[in-house]
């Protein structure tokens, strides 16, 4: 199993906080790091600070050397599709070719309402997502002069200079040149599967149990076959809440600290975790590894370990020590 560290940066994390986290993750042996892309904090914590995902990632790119970086996922409603391709390509150059790009339709209306952004209905957001994915491929892979007529975007004489960094191990486009890995994420809608089958290198299923992941994998396989694609060529991943402790007492202490960070003081951390046992990676190292094996049996190839204790850097060390290279 491959692992990435994932943080919810909109929960009050400054740039310096995120830099400390990614440096710790890189030193601990994580291969990749993702952060959320939200402009508003979650309900119950509306006054916490937020930062722009790609501005932060650009800074992190200059402060790290090995770990790959990305946002999981960037809503297509935040940035014009053409601007987003240029933005990602620029940050890719700054990183030396260590960027992965996650794309989603967006879901949090508060992100938009608080910042004057339009939040269209789900069909229009899915249309924008299709345009965004088409532009990523088109501007990275098509010859100069490319023409595109999408749902909301038109391109004439399309070209992108410079193109992505030609780093080893990256996907190769139809022009024979390498490009960043493209990840689409959703809870598994039929259209989301179709877009993943057509455009994605990886499909990320959010907050799912292994049983749901197994069922969704069959639907994703069918979408790949319908698109004329080998299902095995599409990597399957999941984002899973993660909380580890070396023993049960440490698990409960961390759960209580996590709830306090959510502004939910007075609740029982152990009871809160128990309600999520079928979809979180949690508990002692043995319990966590057992859950990882269940995801692997369901076809998951990479797990984004969603860490809700961003100031507990020892938790990052523990996740890396007990999971990375151990399952």
Model-derived features: positions:
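Active-site-adjacent structural elements that line small-molecule/cofactor binding pockets in enzymes
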Residues: 1-327
């Amino acid at each position: 199993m491959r692992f990435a560290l994932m943080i919810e940066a909109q929960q009050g994390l400054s740039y310096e906080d995120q830099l400390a986290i990614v440096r710790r993750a890189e030193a601990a042996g994580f291969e990749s790091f993702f952060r959320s892309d939200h402009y508003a904090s979650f309900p119950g914590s509306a006054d916490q600070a937020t930062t722009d995902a790609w501005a932060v990632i650009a800074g992190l790119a200059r402060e790290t050397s090995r770990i790959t970086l990305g946002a999981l996922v960037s809503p297509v409603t935040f940035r014009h599709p053409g601007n987003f391709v240029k933005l990602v390509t620029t940050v890719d150059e700054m990183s030396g070719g260590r960027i992965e790009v996650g794309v989603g339709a967006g879901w949090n209306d508060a992100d938009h309402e608080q910042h004057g952004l339009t939040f269209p209905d789900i069909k229009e957001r899915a249309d924008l997502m299709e345009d965004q994915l088409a532009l990523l491929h088109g501007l990275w892979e098509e010859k100069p002069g490319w023409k595109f007529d999408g749902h909301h975007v038109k391109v004439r004489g399309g070209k992108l200079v410079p193109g992505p960094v030609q780093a080893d191990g990256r996907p190769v486009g139809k022009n024979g040149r390498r490009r960043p890995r493209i990840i689409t994420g959703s809870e598994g809608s039929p259209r989301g599967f179709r877009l993943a089958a057509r455009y994605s290198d990886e499909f990320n299923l959010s907050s799912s149990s292994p049983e749901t992941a197994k069922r969704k994998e069959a639907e994703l396989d069918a979408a790949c076959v319908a698109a004329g694609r080998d299902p095995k060529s599409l990597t399957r991943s999941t984002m899973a809440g993660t909380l580890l402790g070396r023993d049960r007492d440490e698990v409960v202490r961390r759960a209580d600290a996590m709830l306090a960070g959510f502004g939910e003081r007075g609740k029982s951390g152990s009871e809160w975790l128990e309600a999520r046992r079928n979809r979180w990676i949690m508990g002692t190292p043995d319990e966590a590894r057992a859950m990882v094996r269940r995801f692997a049996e369901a076809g998951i190839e990479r797990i984004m370990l969603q860490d809700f204790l961003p100031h507990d850097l020892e938790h990052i060390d523990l996740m890396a020590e007990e999971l990375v290279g151990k399952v």
